[in-house]
């Protein structure tokens, strides 16, 4: 049955700036004034808080339920580091990295793959989950790219069975004006698949070539098994600013539905060379 307005009452309130995580009756989140806070989810009472000196990431906290240590652990990006924190008391786990943190900037939540911590910025970096020692660094972008930016700020996803990270990348910089970054600016405003075991980019699919409109992809990829014409496809799905729902095969990056290309308008700005064509997705229907 539906819930009526008079059946609801305010229980408690806190100001937050990201999706909270819930662990064993603890609600943990980041506040606008750079605090990491843990509340009792039943009554909203404060369990612990950690005041950060630098801005914590607003796009995710990783939770590890470590059964070996019988401990719930948080991995929180703050400033240019990722901190490993005991979820029960808010204290750093000092055996990790340098005094409980590693030098690794990221805008999105880390991930765990085979006892490795995966941290994504302009590279896909892996660290030993216990010591924090760097294991590997896999570049997302080409070495000879002619633009800045392109960091995956909207989110990433991990197919732990395949060992593949999927990243939705940001727009190329300088944004809006592309006179000094001619060409498609490959792997910007794109879905990119990175194989952790093969240590390379498997494929990339660019939604907006030579982006001049801030059309980078703001949402995290979604890993899904899609049924189409009585066949199951392993796909990764990305919802974009332009209203597209990009659905690609996870292994190959091939679109599940046919795509076409439409002619793009030319720029009136001297020296600006726009991409002559942009992809046009007809299915699924645009938002």
Regions found by a protein language model. Give the residues of each.
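Aromatic (tryptophan-biased) beta-strands that constitute blades/sheets of beta-rich domains
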Residues: 1-15, 45-52, 91-104, 133-144, ...
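Residue-level recognition of short loop/turn positions
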Residues: 7, 24, 33, 42-43, ...
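Repeat-blade elements of multi-bladed beta-propeller folds
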Residues: 13-35, 54-81, 105-124, 148-180, ...
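Short, solvent-exposed loop/turn and secondary-structure capping segments
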Residues: 32, 39-41, 86-88, 95, ...
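Hydrophobic/aromatic beta-strand positions that recur at structurally equivalent sites within the blades
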Residues: 39-40, 64, 85-86, 127, ...
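Secondary-structure transition/capping motifs at alpha-helix termini
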Residues: 44-45, 68-69, 90-93, 130, ...
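Beta-propeller blade signature
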Residues: 79, 85, 123-133, 184-199, ...
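Phosphate/diphosphate-binding loops
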Residues: 222-268
């Amino acid at each position: 049955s539906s819930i009526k307005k008079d059946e609801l009452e305010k229980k408690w309130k806190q100001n937050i700036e990201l999706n909270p995580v819930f662990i064993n009756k603890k609600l943990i989140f980041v506040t606008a004034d750079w605090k990491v806070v843990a509340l009792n989810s039943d009554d909203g009472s404060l369990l612990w808080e950690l005041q950060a000196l630098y801005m914590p990431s607003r796009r995710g906290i990783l939770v590890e339920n470590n059964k070996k240590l019988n401990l719930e652990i948080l991995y929180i990006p703050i400033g240019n580091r990722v901190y490993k924190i005991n979820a029960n008391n808010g204290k750093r786990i000092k055996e990790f990295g340098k005094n409980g943190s590693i030098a690794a900037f990221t805008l999105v939540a880390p991930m765990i793959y085979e006892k490795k911590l995966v941290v994504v910025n302009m590279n896909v970096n892996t660290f030993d989950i216990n010591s924090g020692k760097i294991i590997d660094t896999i570049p997302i972008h080409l070495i000879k790219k002619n633009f800045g930016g392109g960091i995956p700020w909207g989110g990433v996803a991990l197919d732990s069975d395949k060992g593949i990270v999927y990243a939705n990348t940001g727009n190329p910089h300088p944004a809006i004006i592309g006179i000094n970054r001619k060409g498609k600016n490959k792997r910007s405003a794109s879905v990119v698949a990175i194989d952790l075991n093969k240590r390379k980019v498997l494929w990339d699919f660019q939604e907006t070539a030579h982006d001049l409109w801030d059309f980078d992809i703001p949402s995290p990829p979604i890993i899904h098994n899609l049924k189409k014409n009585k066949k199951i496809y392993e796909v990764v799905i990305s919802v974009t600013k332009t209203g597209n729902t990009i659905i690609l095969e996870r292994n190959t990056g091939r679109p599940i539905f046919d795509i076409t290309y439409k002619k793009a308008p030319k720029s009136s700005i001297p020296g600006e060379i726009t991409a002559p064509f942009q992809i046009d997705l007809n299915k699924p229907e645009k938002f």
